[in-house]
Regions:
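Short, amphipathic alpha-helical interface elements at domain boundaries
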Residues: 1-160
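Juxtamembrane "helix exit" motif at the C-terminal ends of alpha-helical transmembrane segments
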Residues: 166-167
Length: 167
């Protein structure tokens, strides 16, 4: 529910982090949800455009990074991290996926098929992306006094003590 979120400008990653209550960072399953929902949020903010394109009888989606006035839209740090990942994927898709650039390649566009291939071929960049998002979210939420690191440490210590007592 929207009313459960702490702020109107809360990013999808912040919302998931708060609502899950697991302050150790995102799991590998969570990062896919965060990535997808942030892409949709960037589309709503008109930072990117998502459109369906035909792909040999199947439908694919194309993400286009739109030109921006640097002062027009405010993005959260985790949204900037994911946008930069998309920009890098767009620029490097032809080199890493097809072995060379094509003349028709637009450095501001990538299909979902190309993005999935880029992600699967660059697992270390995905690990770095997850780490950067975890750090950005924790920093933003603690600086806004939504999370208290001391309280989280106490909670984790109590949880560890409980699990040791159970075994």
């Amino acid at each position: 529910y929207f009313r459960d979120l702490p702020r109107a400008d809360c990013s999808p990653a912040e919302a998931l982090y708060i609502l899950q209550g697991n302050y150790q960072g995102f799991t590998q399953y969570d990062i896919g949800k965060v990535f997808s929902s942030t892409i949709l949020n960037l589309s709503l903010k008109k930072i990117i455009k998502i459109e369906e394109i035909p792909d040999g009888g199947k439908n694919d989606s194309k993400i286009t990074i739109l030109p921006q006035d640097t002062n027009s839209v405010s993005l959260n740090s985790d949204e900037i991290i994911i946008l930069n990942f998309l920009i890098t994927a767009c620029k490097n898709k032809s080199k890493s996926i097809f072995g060379g650039s094509k003349e028709s390649d637009n450095p501001n566009e990538i299909t979902m098929k190309e993005l999935k291939k880029y992600i699967s071929n660059n697992s270390s960049k995905v690990v770095s992306l997850k780490s950067a998002i975890d750090k950005a979210i924790k920093s933003k939420l603690t600086s806004n006094r939504i999370l208290d690191l001391k309280g989280i440490k106490r909670r984790n210590a109590n949880m560890a003590g409980c699990s040791i007592g159970v075994f």
